[in-house]
Regions:
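Active-site loop/oxyanion-hole signature of alpha/beta-hydrolase fold enzymes
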Residues: 1-41, 53
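Short aromatic-enriched loop/helix-cap "lid" or pocket-rim segments at secondary-structure transitions
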Residues: 5-8, 72-77, 125
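Extended interaction regions within the primary functional domain
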Residues: 8-13, 36, 44-45, 58, ...
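Amphipathic alpha-helical segments in well-structured domains
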Residues: 15, 19-22, 77, 81, ...
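Short hydrophobic/charged patches on amphipathic alpha-helices used for structural packing
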Residues: 23, 162-165
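Conserved hydrolase catalytic core segment
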Residues: 32-79
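Alpha/beta-hydrolase
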Residues: 82-83, 90-163
Length: 166
């Protein structure tokens, strides 16, 4: 488990591939009926799977910490950035405009944004499942989403299922 990450394959980091993987996994495991949990990015995939693929045997979905549209996420992120100290707002704006996310000022601002709105650092007090090493790379995140939580520029930048939700 957890050994499916593939490096240096940016062509894999898009919705179509992820949903095809889910379809193939269901077939391989004979999962004719399922209850599907979509957490974060997985929630986006769950919504797209339900809205655009109309899968059979889907008994229920559980969505956790996800979004219906990238533009809405970016808009809300900008609202939260506007509540940060001015120097951090300036560092984020400068990095976004230049495409250079390497400055210490930007790194500090992004870390603070993540601490406030996403997740803090994992400590020894956290459950073991959060502390164990994970096999992952940044490529899937950057190609799929973008350079950070608040700048969707990747393959999911146009993701929007709002009109399909009823």
């Amino acid at each position: 488990c957890g050994n499916s990450y593939v490096e240096n394959r940016p062509d894999l980091w898009n919705s179509k591939v992820w949903i095809e993987e889910l379809i193939e996994l269901r077939k391989h495991l004979g999962l004719d009926e399922i209850h599907l949990l979509g957490q974060s990015w997985g929630g986006m995939q769950t919504l797209e799977y339900v809205c655009n693929y109309k899968p059979e045997g889907l008994k229920s979905i559980i969505l956790s910490s996800t979004l219906p549209a990238s533009w809405l996420w970016a808009e809300e992120a900008q609202r939260m950035i506007a509540q940060m100290p001015q120097d951090m707002q300036d560092a984020i704006k400068k990095a976004t405009e230049s495409g250079d996310y390497s400055s210490p000022e930007y790194q500090a601002a992004e870390a603070e944004y993540m601490r406030q709105h996403c997740a803090g650092e994992v400590t020894e007090n956290d459950p073991e499942c959060l502390r164990r090493p994970k096999k992952a790379g940044r490529e899937s995140y950057v190609v799929g989403w973008g350079p950070n939580e608040f700048t969707p520029l990747g393959t999911l930048k146009d993701y929007d299922v709002i009109d399909q939700l009823g």
